[in-house]
Amino acid sequence: MISNNAPAKMVLNSVLTGYTLAYIQHSIYSDYDVIGRSFWLKEGSNVTRRDFTGIDTFSVTINNLKPTTTYEVQGAFYDSIIDSELLNAQIGINLSDKQTFKMKSAPRITGARCESEPVDVGVGAPIVYIDTTGEADYCTIELKDNSNANNPWVKYYVGALMPTIMFGGVPIGSYKVRISGQISLPDGVTIDSSGYYEYPNVFEVRYNFVPPAAPINIVFKAARIADGKERYDLRVQWDWNRGAGANVREFVLSYIDSAEFVRTGWTKAQKINVGAAQSATIISFPWKVEHKFKVSSIAWGPDAQDVTDSAVQTFILNESTPLDNSFVNETGIEVNYAYIKGKIKDGSTWKQTFLIDAATGAINIGLLDAEGKAPISFDPVKKIVNVDGSVITKTINAANFVMTNLTGQDNPAIYTQGKTWGDTKSGIWMGMDNVTAKPKLDIGNATQYIRYDGNILRISSEVVIGTPNGDIDIQTGIQGKQTVFIYIIGTSLPAKPTSPAYPPSGWSKTPPNRTSNTQNIYCSTGTLDPVTNQLVSGTSWSDVVQWSGTEGVDGRPGATGQRGPGMYSLAIANLTAWNDSQANSFFTSNFGSGPVKYDVLTEYKSGAPGTAFTRQWNGSAWTSPAMVLHGDMIVNGTVTASKIVANNAFLSQIGVNIIYDRAAALSSNPEGSYKMKIDLQNGYIHIR
């Protein structure tokens, strides 16, 4: 039987899980002899125990757990009297209530693909889309170029885990992809990583350019023109719908004699570029000569994909061709001493399509709008070209830019004239490097700059990070998520705070001072996001527990204790026999009182110490011991005694019924005054 006051019951405040680590926050201990904590984890029917000998924190991190697995946990404090066998039997401790938690699921990739950013003109940059499942505070995605098995894994994304993650900056090629998840535990130091999961399929990163749609519904109209000398003009027109393809840049009509087409194909064909118009007119088309026709849609894009041809059409002008002179009168040209003007007939109204002024050289191009404004105009006096729309070109000097990768092979950039990336000249350079598919930035000069090479951002001057809590310099940095404590003083247990603020109203970050014995200090914990200075989204403050101890009443002063026994000697002149009065006088003179039980005194003759007498005080009289040994004694056999009282004794074997602490053994009532008693006869230990 072991009698011992068990430590107070542990309270499990919260359990925060990772993939293989669980962070358990628990209550404080109130027993000063606590030396450790134990936790029992139950997985199905299997129970394991984890021991922690440190007591300097109120949390533990349990490792070697299984992702996505559900566990049941109980915890308890234990003191020095509790050994491993008692812990296994859960004897002499107060177990916490059970709490169930589930480990996080590691991130997995369910799909990987490449799409292009939508653009009106040219080729959009390729964007990688990664579909994921699982849980993480943040994740890391790495790609490996599949062209060579020795290529390294390259980190392309570190950030929040979302169902679909998008990122760019990946060069064209075939890639393997892998993902790992990370969870930050509230201690602010430990990060639980899931390890890498590699997607089994290789995916392609490429320019997902969709060629323009082909022209359709090609129609031929012939007109007979009696303008001095008879001729035939041919109008070719078509339809075009963008559909899912690229925007058209211009249309080109190609036509060739069928006989020549047989010999050389389209090599010697004649071409008419009509821009965005969807018709072309051929003046003086030959009579009874068969021709092949096609119309090409041309867009800004890669050279091999930017042209789409219509189906080839065959046409011959002969007696059976119906004539339609309607298109002849749709347009007109005015040429005089003042200007050259083009016009088109809209119903009964002629509308201007272009005008060249003879006096100034001013030019207006395009159909006028309701206010008379042309899409393009040139002012020769101010030397300004005005464009009401967009200009598509490969090089332009301007104050404002919209960078476009027109063919998929360009390196669009904005830069100060003469400035190149990374040089010492003052100015700016910002653009894309198509060799590495990474954006680059250079602002400043040789010594003062912000420079990004696609992987590393370098800033020569001081950097300050703005947060809701004020600016933080880069040397200090932003602290990660952490466990924080809040305190409040009161006479009864308060309700758990509902505000995520740190600290909530009425609470403090440090323990307050008590001004009365009736007051207690109460505590709660939570996981803080230092960026917002509030609890991490989705979490709350733990249940409130009492942090301060219970104030006890003052104790009564104890009685003066008895002097402990000792061994003494006394020189007496002309000593011939033991003298009680001399012995009693020795203790009265030196200690102010008579001898105490077990005091030992040796009286010897002055000048002849060989004459000596030793007695022990038994509490009422001086008695002669059976043997007196002046010095050390080594006994190989057995020493049998009804009582042994000693300051130090070294015994390899001892056979006794009861062992008391020394003060109790010296008292007149050891059973009533002992602090510790070992009863070897009945088999129990008792500590008061």
Curated annotation (Swiss-Prot):
Entry keywords, A to Z: Late protein, Viral tail protein, Virion
Subcellular localization(s) per the UniProt record: Virion
The UniProt record lists the keyword Membrane: no
GO cellular-component term (any): virus tail
Subunit organization: Homotrimer. Interacts with baseplate hub protein pb3. Interacts with receptor-binding protein pb5.
Stated role: Together with BHP-pb3, forms the central straight fiber, bearing the receptor binding protein RBP-pb5 at its C-terminus. Upon RBP-pb5 binding to the host receptor FhuA, the central fiber reorganizes and undergoes structural rearrangements that lead to its bending, bringing BHP-pb3 close to the host membrane for anchoring.
UniProt protein name: Straight fiber protein pb4
UniProt organism field: Escherichia phage T5 (Enterobacteria phage T5)
